[in-house]
Amino acid sequence: MAKFLIVEARFYDHLNDMLVAGAKAALKEAGHEVEVITVPGALEIPGAIALADQSEDYDGYVAIGVVIRGETYHFEIVAGESARGIMALTMDGVAIGNGILTVENEAQALVRADPKQKDKGGEAAKAALALLALRERWS
């Protein structure tokens, strides 16, 4: 049994609840332990994962958040930099599933977050599981 940390940026509570539910369900169904922490925003997710990984308490991570395009350039910065930070950690061997939605509107987010529809939280958890399996295979 592995231990996973879900790191969520809570901004849209109802959407986050669905994403976290999907991720938890996938991890628990696979027989793993799950903990959840909250950070202020998507930009803080990679940093929180890096700090948690130093503790060696967790085997893998799931990043959860929702970034909806607004009227300013902020969307591009948050979407790009959070993904870049997660990818940098992944390239260093950290097993992370990226469940940060980057969408045009709330309707798109709802379809992707809902475990009964696209279940992107569950998909992110399964990606983390797959990366953990690869890391264990090649370690």
Curated annotation (Swiss-Prot):
GO terms for biological process: riboflavin biosynthetic process. The gene is ribH. 5-amino-6-(D-ribitylamino)uracil binds at F11, A42, L43, E44, V66, V67, I68, N98. It comes from the Bacteria. InterPro entries: LS, LS/RS, LS/RS_sf. GO terms for cellular component: cytosol; riboflavin synthase complex. Keywords: Riboflavin biosynthesis, Transferase. Catalyzes the formation of 6,7-dimethyl-8-ribityllumazine by condensation of 5-amino-6-(D-ribitylamino)uracil with 3,4-dihydroxy-2-butanone 4-phosphate. This is the penultimate step in the biosynthesis of riboflavin. Its EC number is 2.5.1.78. This is 6,7-dimethyl-8-ribityllumazine synthase. One of its GO terms (molecular function) is 6,7-dimethyl-8-ribityllumazine synthase activity. Pfam families: DMRL_synthase (PF00885).
